[in-house]
């Protein structure tokens, strides 16, 4: 009896997790094709992808993996610890994330453009390599983080 209840709870929990996982990728499918994903994941520096609406794509993708917050600004709480695990220089990363999440950027740009602006900014800092490694873990499936965006 207890075993069947445990099994039922496990089953219901796993269905809930699958639904949570499915939401971001389904939401971003129209702006994040596998071709666009390959271009973005393979990039070593900031580049514009011609066939993508960069603002819409970055807004959707970066929100889905919690790299930016609900306003489109860089999410320091979500990024700092994972970036410190990759490279210990936490002060550099904190400063760079904060400088790319300035009030000027988050208040003057329209909300749908903020995530793209954050990505573009952080990819021009000394934290670029570490950020890109964390980005690739979350978005591209490189590393141990969950990949929301399998084509």
Summary of predicted features, one role per range:
Residues 3-22:
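Cleavable N-terminal signal peptides of Sec/SRP-targeted secreted and luminal proteins
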